[in-house]
Swiss-Prot record:
It comes from Oryza sativa subsp. japonica. It is found in: Mitochondrion inner membrane. This is Cytochrome c oxidase subunit 1. Heme a3 binds at H378. Ca(2+) binds at E41, G46, P443.
Length: 524
């Protein structure tokens, strides 16, 4: 009973962070299962496993997207690593609002249940994660499926807003003595910028899907031209949230990668202030480029010119970050442990994803490539090999601190190489499919596309083997006896620890700091 009470009513940031990790792992496995079903259907031309049920295919795609974005990456990155390490890194005893932290987590399981139940009601919600009307309207999706998906989004949105309020308050008000803003670790900065993005963008999504809900159920016509509405308005509202959302997914990863590159190159991060301002710039610019998702809806030519230019400008702060990571490694004494492998893999693959993003920023090119597999390849390079590689990197980097035990290094490296090979084999051929004009969200295709699709599907099976390796690593690390206890500072940064988490025991005490740490060292 006491154990149940501890986990249900916990107000401890580490316990809640652990709950987020467990939740993210469960949702991630479910999302992976959906993605494998998608790739099995696309493994060869014709109907493979879904018996020609195109609606079911789109339900799988929608569920895969929602699970991976709202129930895997965000809970693990912001809820998991954020809750676990932001208070420790700034020298705070806990989060500012511990009970708010508890409900932020417990809103997510009901939200997940609503999403899964939407797939089981009538024909499911086959709208894609964008939920565009008129496809998501009551004429095209009668029944309760889309409404359940909307309520699911509302709940996870409220969870994220409450969490972001908590992080902003904690980082501004609960830093230890001497921890000025310009001494904040980069991961804390990344969570702060992410929290602001969430706070500003999610209410817009909430407004859009609430309008959609009333259109469906109460006969309003916000998005129905028959009553003077406009479905393009929904697209503007959705993407005003949706574009900052992709930066919400990747920014905490930037912070994690900065820590890892610095630690394993044995050097402080190159251009700390530049890194901070680059993240802030990405956050601001992220709100000014949303219509690049809408080049094909008939925007004015001047509007398209602006959004093309603005989108390309976002590449500048992103490039600053990438070159700063490379400069940090330059001349460093690099150790290729598992976290560093994932970090280098992240930098390499995220750069490829960024370059295809520059291609898609051109409105003229995008008109040809929009809604083809080129776009799928682009955002999976950014997310499936950006955000997810950052998650794995952070896991291997901090797992000793979380469990108090070291992970098996060889198995970790095997996990990296299998996953690296698998995801590249899955997503690189999609560029060729997209350039050949293969459209997204369609479960069948002409025979001409068969070769690359077969390769892509094979790659996804390899990725699953890699993920299975990962869970083997988790099982071995978390079980006692098979591996040695983790030192306070497993990466040998005792001589010059730049961040506070390496000064506390592994795992940290239930209350991390007996007294507040005073931060005296200036940043070199």
């Amino acid at each position: 009973m006491t154990n149940l009470v501890r986990w249900l009513f916990s107000t401890n940031h580490k316990d809640i962070g652990t709950l987020y990790f467990i939740f993210g792992a469960i949702a991630g496995v479910m999302g992976t299962c959906f993605s494998v079903l998608i790739r099995m259907e696309l493994a060869r031309p014709g109907d493979q496993i879904l018996g020609g049920n195109h609606q079911l295919y789109n339900v799988l795609i929608t569920a895969h997207a929602f699970l991976m974005i709202f129930f895997m990456v965000m809970p693990a990155m912001i809820g998991g690593f954020g809750n676990w390490f932001v208070p420790i890194l700034i020298g705070a005893p806990d989060m500012a609002f511990p009970r708010l932290n508890n409900i932020s987590f417990w809103l997510l399981p009901p939200s997940l249940l609503l999403l899964l139940s939407s797939a089981l009601v009538e024909v499911g919600s086959g709208t894609g994660w964008t939920v565009y009307p008129p496809l998501s309207g009551i004429t095209s999706h009668s029944g309760g499926a889309v409404d359940l998906a909307i309520f699911s989004l509302h709940l996870s949105g409220v969870s994220s807003i409450l969490g972001s309020i908590n992080f902003i308050t904690t980082i501004f008000n609960m830093r230890g003595p001497g921890m000025t803003m310009h001494r904040l670790p980069l991961f804390v900065w990344s969570v702060l910028v992410t929290a602001f993005l969430l706070l500003l963008s999610l209410p817009v999504l909430a407004g859009a899907i609430t309008m959609l809900l009333t259109d469906r159920n109460f006969n309003t016509t916000f998005f129905d031209p028959a009553g003077g509405g406009d479905p393009i308005l929904y697209q503007h509202l959705f993407w005003f949230f949706g574009h900052p959302e992709v930066y919400i997914l990747i920014l905490p990863g930037f912070g994690i990668i900065s820590h890892i590159v610095s630690t394993f190159s044995r050097k402080p991060v190159f251009g700390y202030l530049g890194m901070v301002y680059a993240m802030i710039s990405i956050g601001v610019l992220g709100f000014l480029v949303w219509a690049h998702h809408m080049f094909t809806v008939g925007l004015d030519v001047d509007t398209r010119a602006y959004f093309t230019a603005a989108t390309m400008i976002i590449a500048v702060p992103t490039g600053i970050k990438i070159f700063s990571w490379i400069a940090t490694m330059w001349g460093g004494s690099i150790q290729y442990k598992t976290p560093m492998l994932f970090a280098v893999g992240f930098i390499f693959l995220f750069t490829i994803g960024g370059l295809t993003g520059i291609v898609l920023a051109n409105s003229g090119l995008d008109i040809a490539l929009h809604d083809t597999y080129y776009v799928v390849a682009h955002f999976h390079y950014v997310l499936s090999m950006g955000a997810v590689f950052a998650l794995f990197a952070g896991f291997y980097y901090w797992v000793g601190k979380i469990f108090g035990r070291t992970y098996p290094e060889t198995l970790g490296q095997i996990h990296f190489w299998i996953t690296f090979f698998g995801v590249n084999l899955t997503f690189f051929p999609m560029h060729f499919l997209g350039l050949s004009g293969m459209p997204r969200r369609i479960p069948d295709y002409p025979d001409a596309y068969a070769g690359w699709n077969a390769l892509s599907s094979f790659g996804s099976y390899i990725s699953v083997v890699g993920i299975r390796r990962f869970f083997v690593v988790v099982a071995i690390t978390s079980s006692s006896g098979k591996n040695k206890r983790c030192a306070e500072s497993p990466w040998a940064v005792e001589q010059n620890p730049t961040t506070l988490e390496w000064l506390v025991q592994s795992p940290p005490a239930f209350h991390t700091f007996g007294e507040l740490p005073a931060i005296k060292e200036t940043k070199s």
